[in-house]
């Protein structure tokens, strides 16, 4: 099913689109967290630290691919909002062909570079082999990552955010079951978790293809899936590359921070891994609320409906703030039982609790910055989102480097560097937003 977001009441339309996105990411985060919980409980702290230190590199590759899909999805949304079905078809087929070639090459490079990249991150020698094996399995399955993210982004661009959620729910349950089977029953350790993740994502791809062929006429292309429109490739690459670089910049900053944490020892790494999984429950849904804003705004921008574009932007910001407040309260009140889900060691639990409580104090800031970025993406100005993300990560890493190695601060003070990064984003984004509003561009 598709949904025309250029008509109807703005608030219910945006909420209806946003909720499946948020739920989908919560399910995805749940099975990511399940990897950590199962590894931590059934394999041990070393394996948990290895999975945690591998996660930034794994996420970098996934987010880069997701960024390509997100950028192409904006073009699909704009064409769909304008009622240009032929352009939608050609945009989808061109992205599918170019993305397949890219993801295969990218996957091979990632597998080959897994060891040197982990060494660059200063991963301790005792957990390096575990981390390498985990990463290589995940990287080998990046073709499935591309196809799922591409198909899901395309459905969302056409206003269908619910279908991808249903597939992801099924995949999440199977992934958790696979984790338990491969790790607890077969004793395959962290490699079993990685294999379970890849297989569950492959299933998502199959389900998406079946659904599209049955329910979405505009994507039932048949042989037209093989149509490659070189005239659309330049815009696709420009949007996709800028969006991918924005996503990659954010993750590169996280990798640099992970490298700093790695100097604090295995206990700090395990605590950081557990707390960061909870952090993901704050940041990822906030990003997806912004993605919902992008879709609604892009469709209406393509249809030339400026007032609906503005209404969608401010409605999305309100949703961001409410979510940030709720999660802040939960993490402040229940930090200890949450961290205890991941590890049993009292020292690691104490480190994780202190980190999480400090991090939760800043949860409103990424809500605002993500909302503003969603607005600029919806208007097609991806350079603003890239620049602001670079500022965020640059200042975050600089602040972390000063706090931890130079001032010898404890792990719990690391989230202060996050706040400094988000503040730099706001200082850059707010004047541009005010200018857009004054010039009636938004």
What role is predicted for each listed range?
Residues 1-18, 76-141, 185-241, 297-362, ...:
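Short alpha-helical transmembrane segments in multi-pass integral membrane proteins
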Residues 7, 11-30, 34, 57-64, ...:
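Residue-level signal for short hydrophobic patches within transmembrane helices
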Residues 16-35, 137, 171, 200-204, ...:
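Transmembrane helical elements of multi-pass membrane transporters/channels
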Residues 22, 26, 30, 34, ...:
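Generic alpha-helical transmembrane segments of integral inner-membrane proteins
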Residues 26, 30-49, 118-125, 181-188, ...:
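Helix-terminus/linker motif at the lipid-water interface of multi-pass membrane proteins
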Residues 39-59, 126-130, 190-193, 232-239, ...:
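Interfacial/gating helices of multi-pass transporter permease domains
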Residues 48-108, 145-164, 271-335, 366-380, ...:
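Small-residue-rich hydrophobic transmembrane alpha-helices
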Residues 69, 137-156, 164-172, 193-208, ...:
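Short runs within selected transmembrane alpha-helices of multi-pass transporters and secretion channels
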